[in-house]
């Protein structure tokens, strides 16, 4: 039961995600209004909607977060950098960047580092590096985490949500690796309050989810949470 957990306000942990391919401008306004109303950390949307979200949230607390190289991470370094710079120009202050998994798995760690470092240095914004942990071994997770931290990442993010969701085990592992030097964003498949609280207690400092409103309703109606 949610009532058995510590009294944690989950709202400031939530990156309110709208990453469905069918997202509309009307939904973007709805997500921004919800993020402001419930004091979420950010809205996380595709680059095409960054300018709209930045205008809606101007002067308000929630940040505008977007995704770079999403969801595969397989675009070229120059394309990712351009995408990131354009997003910042349009008003994004947080960038969730998918790591180049092919380079990582083939041992080309220099390419992985260079790509992340360029985005961190040239944008000067919060960068959350998406590791896609469900596709990595524990050894690869450590290598990827170390590269991202050395390159200047602000957060490590577990997943895109396209290849499975966040797990408590992965969050614990990342906390052990990072020793709290950077934040940890758990993302993918977060649908219940208990699941969200388990991830926070394991070490997550952000939660990426499209179910933020559901989590708030579960928080406010604990008697209905199973």
From Swiss-Prot:
SUPFAM superfamilies according to UniProt: Aldolase
Pathway entry: Carbohydrate degradation; 2-deoxy-D-ribose 1-phosphate degradation; D-glyceraldehyde 3-phosphate and acetaldehyde from 2-deoxy-alpha-D-ribose 1-phosphate: step 2/2
Q: Catalyses which reaction?
A: 2-deoxy-D-ribose 5-phosphate = D-glyceraldehyde 3-phosphate + acetaldehyde
Q: Does the keyword Lyase apply?
A: yes
According to its UniProt record, this protein's enzyme class is: lyase
E.C. numbers: 4.1.2.4
| Catalytic-site annotation from UniProt | 96 (proton donor/acceptor), 157 (schiff-base intermediate with acetaldehyde), 185 (proton donor/acceptor)
Task: List GO BP terms, alphabetically.
Answer: 2-deoxyribose 1-phosphate catabolic process; carbohydrate catabolic process; deoxyribonucleotide catabolic process
Key word Cytoplasm present: yes
Please provide, in alphabetical order, the Gene Ontology terms of the cellular component aspect for this entry.
Answer: cytoplasm
Location comes to: Cytoplasm
Q: Which domain of life is it from?
A: Bacteria
**Which keywords appear in this protein's UniProt record, sorted alphabetically?**
Cytoplasm, Lyase, Schiff base
What InterPro entries does the annotation carry? Aldolase_TIM (IPR013785), DeoC (IPR011343), DeoC/FbaB/LacD_aldolase (IPR002915), DeoC_typeI (IPR028581)
Q: Record's Pfam families?
A: DeoC
Q: Which GO terms describe its molecular function?
A: deoxyribose-phosphate aldolase activity
Transmembrane annotation, as ranges = none
| Annotated family | Belongs to the DeoC/FbaB aldolase family. DeoC type 1 subfamily.
Q: Tell me, in a sentence or two, what this protein's role is.
A: Catalyzes a reversible aldol reaction between acetaldehyde and D-glyceraldehyde 3-phosphate to generate 2-deoxy-D-ribose 5-phosphate.
HAMAP family the record matches: DeoC_type1 (MF_00114)
User: What NCBIfam families is this protein classified in?
Assistant: deoC
Name it: Deoxyribose-phosphate aldolase
Q: Which organism is it from?
A: Trichormus variabilis (strain ATCC 29413 / PCC 7937) (Anabaena variabilis)
UniProt lists the gene as deoC
């Amino acid at each position: 039961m949610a009532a058995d957990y510590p009294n944690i306000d989950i709202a400031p942990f939530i990156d309110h995600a709208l990453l469905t391919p069918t997202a509309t401008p009307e939904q973007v306004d709805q997500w921004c209004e919800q993020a402001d109303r419930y004091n979420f950390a950010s809205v996380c949307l595709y680059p095409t909607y960054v300018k709209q979200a930045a205008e809606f949230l101007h002067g308000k607390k929630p940040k505008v977060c977007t995704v770079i190289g999403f969801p595969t991470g397989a675009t070229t370094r120059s394309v990712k950098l351009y995408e990131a710079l354009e997003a910042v120009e349009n008003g994004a202050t947080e960038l969730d960047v998918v790591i180049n998994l092919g380079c990582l798995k083939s041992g080309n760690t220099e390419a992985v580092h260079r790509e992340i470092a360029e985005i961190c240095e040239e944008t000067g914004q919060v960068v959350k590096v998406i590791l896609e942990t469900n596709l990595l071994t524990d050894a690869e997770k450590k290598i990827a985490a170390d590269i991202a931290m050395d390159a200047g990442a602000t957060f490590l993010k577990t997943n895109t949500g396209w290849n499975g969701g966040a797990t408590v085990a992965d969050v614990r592992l990342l906390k052990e690796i990072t020793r709290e030097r950077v934040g940890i964003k758990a993302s993918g498949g977060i649908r219940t309050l208990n699941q969200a609280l388990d991830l926070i207690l394991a070490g997550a400092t952000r939660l990426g989810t499209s179910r933020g409103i559901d989590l708030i309703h579960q928080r406010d109606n604990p008697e209905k949470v199973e």
